[in-house]
């Protein structure tokens, strides 16, 4: 990875007179992490005012439908409720053959075997939240075991939560080691790292968390668990997109984005789409690199595409 080369050269050059920093702090120095929250708010306002309307059309809404991670992460989930969700995804293909199916079904790993045995639609990924979601606070052995078992049961993508407390204590090495170990447990499965942006306090922290997560092995960065007071915001997504772009420019490695939590309206979804389009461009506008974690949005998108209220999901 190009970035480590930069860092090694950098360390070699400075080691005799600078206090020894670890390679993670060194990585952060290669990026602009001093970000003004007010500037970000203004930039987002401008995008919403000037650009979102360009994407307010049926084609984009179809694309968004195909980017949805149909999510059920409730304490009340049961085999029955999850099976009902899978059957809707199975039926959707028959009922709306001209519309794209959702990108994934996202659930707790106890349901993975059930989902993988009952899902009949090709190309719908099975996503599990692993590693003691949503707090991430469990022993590493437990987190690794949960992840390996999920993959074994048929999960095709894994969502984990960054250890937020370690990040806020500036234990960047601990953060990266944890993420790297989880990545190892995922094997070939793409891994999304949830930054829990609503708990990070400011744009600079969101930028730092994004960089550390990518550097430690994230294939996607995701805004939120949906379990905290503040979930996804356009401002957080804007900063995350900037980080993804800078990381791509430096390393050539493309990282995906998943806004999730509190995406309640079609306009919310269009806003995230527009931010990605403006900052990252066309290359990210496929359902491989752009995902929306939501449950309630699916019917709203479907209703707008069809032109009447639909409660399919």
Give the role of each language-model region.
Residues 299:
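Metal-centered catalytic cores of metalloenzymes
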Residues 18-21, 36:
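Anionic, Ser/Thr-rich low-complexity intrinsically disordered regions
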Residues 3-19:
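Histidine-centered metal-binding segments
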Residues 52-67, 74-100, 110-257, 264-295, ...:
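Alpha/beta enzyme core
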Residues 18, 27-31:
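Polar/charged low-complexity regulatory segments
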Residues 105-107:
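Short, hydrophobic beta-strand segments that form beta-sheet elements in well-ordered domains
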Residues 46-47:
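N-terminal basic/disordered segments at the start of proteins
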């Amino acid at each position: 990875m190009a970035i480590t080369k930069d860092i090694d050269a950098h360390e070699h050059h400075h080691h005799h007179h600078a206090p020894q920093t670890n390679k993670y702090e060194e990585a952060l120095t290669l990026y602009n992490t001093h970000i003004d929250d007010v500037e970000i708010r203004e930039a987002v306002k401008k995008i919403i005012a000037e650009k979102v309307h360009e994407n307010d059309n049926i084609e984009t809404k179809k694309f968004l439908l195909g980017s949805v991670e149909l999510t059920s992460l409730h304490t009340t989930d049961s085999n029955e409720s999850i099976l009902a969700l899978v059957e809707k995804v199975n039926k959707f293909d028959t009922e709306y053959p001209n519309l794209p199916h959702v990108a994934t079904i996202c659930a707790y790993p106890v349901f993975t075997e059930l989902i993988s045995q009952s899902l009949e639609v090709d190309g719908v990924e099975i996503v599990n939240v692993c590693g003691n979601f949503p707090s991430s606070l469990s022993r590493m052995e437990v987190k690794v075991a949960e992840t390996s078992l999920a993959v074994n049961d048929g999960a095709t993508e894994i969502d984990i939560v960054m250890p937020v407390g370690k990040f806020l204590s500036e234990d960047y090495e601990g953060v990266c080691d944890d993420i790297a170990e989880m990545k190892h447990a995922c094997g070939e499965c793409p891994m999304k790292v949830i930054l829990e942006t609503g708990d990070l306090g400011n744009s600079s922290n969101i930028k730092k968390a994004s960089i550390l997560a990518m550097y430690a092995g994230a294939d996607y960065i995701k805004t939120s668990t949906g379990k905290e007071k503040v979930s996804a915001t356009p401002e957080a997504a804007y900063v995350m997109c900037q980080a993804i772009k800078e990381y791509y420019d430096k390393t050539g490695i493309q990282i995906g984005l998943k806004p999730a939590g509190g995406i309640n309206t079609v306009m919310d979804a269009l806003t995230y789409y527009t931010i990605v389009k403006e900052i990252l461009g066309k290359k990210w506008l496929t359902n491989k690199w752009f995902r929306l974690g939501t449950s309630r949005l699916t019917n709203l998108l479907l209703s707008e595409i069809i032109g009447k209220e639909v409660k399919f999901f």
